[in-house]
Amino acid sequence: METRYQRHIQLDEVGTTGQEKIKKAKVLVIGAGGLGCPALQYLTAAGVGLLGIMDPDMVSISNLQRQILYNEDDLGNNKALCAKEHLRKLNAEIELKAFPWALTHDNAAEHIAEFDLVLDGTDNFYTRYLISDQCILLNKVMVYGALYKFEGQVSVFNYRNGPSYRCLFPSPPQAGTIPNCSEIGVLGVVSGIIGVYQALETLKVILELDTALSGKLLCVNVLNHQNSILDFVKNQKEIDQIKKQGKTIPIENEDCFVDFELSLEQLSSNEKIMWIDVR
C-alpha cells in the first residue's frame, strides 16, 4: 500500500530518516503572498511538522493573479487565517499556526525563537532586515526570495555558520529608489517558481544537505532563461555588529518596500561577488 510520503522515502537523500526530520521540523513563513503561498503548499505537502503562517494583510482581487492558495471566497479575509484553512485540507497530519499580524521589533524574537527556520516571503526592507537580524541573534536559518518583473532571487542565510543577509546587502537603499511589484508588475508564475525554490531550499536545510544555497545567490530570469549563481562571502564584521548590539538595527523608513534587492548590473559591480553562469 502506498503511503503519503512514499515518493520521498524512495529517495536515497531522504529515506525514512529524512522524512522523520521533515516531520520534526518547525518552519515559520513570514508573508503569505506571492512567495509564501507556493512555499506553504509544498512544505505542507512534504509533511513539515509545524508550519507558522504570519501575514497581517487581507486577500484582495489583485492577489489572485499569483497567490493561488486563495480563491474569490477569501476576498477581504486575512491571508494567514485563509492559508491555514486551505492547507489543513491538504494535510491534516501537520500542525499549522496562523499569526494574523505583522512582525515587529516587539514580537520578532518571541515568534522566531519558536521555529527552526524562517522562510522570508516579505516585500519590504523593514521586515526583511528585522528577520535577518533576529535570525543572526537566535542562530536561525533564513531562506530568502525576491521578485522583479520576470526575475527572481533565492538564497539561504546563516546555514552552518555561513553568510547572512547583511553580508550580501549590508544596508537598505534609500526609500523610493527601488520600486515594488504594485508599481512595476510581476508575472504571476514567477512568484510560483521562486516560492517553490524557497520550499526546496528549506527542505535541503531540514535534510542537512550540503547543496543548500548558502553563500550563493541564485538569480533566475524566466524571460530569457539566463540564470546565474553569484558566490559571496561571509562578512563577520556585519554579523558581529548585530551580536554586539544584542538587538536588531532599526530601519529608518518602515514603509520602504522592495520586491527585488538589486539589479544584476548593480550586483556585478560588487567585488566580493563571483558570477557563475548556470545555463
Describe each model-derived feature in a short phrase.
Residues M1-L28, T248-C256:
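N-terminal charged helix/coil linker that caps or initiates catalytic domains
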Residues I30-G31, M54:
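Conserved N-terminal Rossmann-fold NAD(P)-binding element of oxidoreductases
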Residues A45-L50:
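Conserved S-adenosyl-L-methionine
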Residues I53-L90:
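Glycine-rich phosphate-binding loop and adjoining beta1-alpha1-beta2 segment
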Residues N91, E95-F99, L103-T104, E114-I194:
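E1/E1-like adenylate-forming module used to activate ubiquitin-like modifiers
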Residues N221-R279:
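Flexible, polar/low-complexity N-terminal or interdomain linker segments that lie immediately upstream
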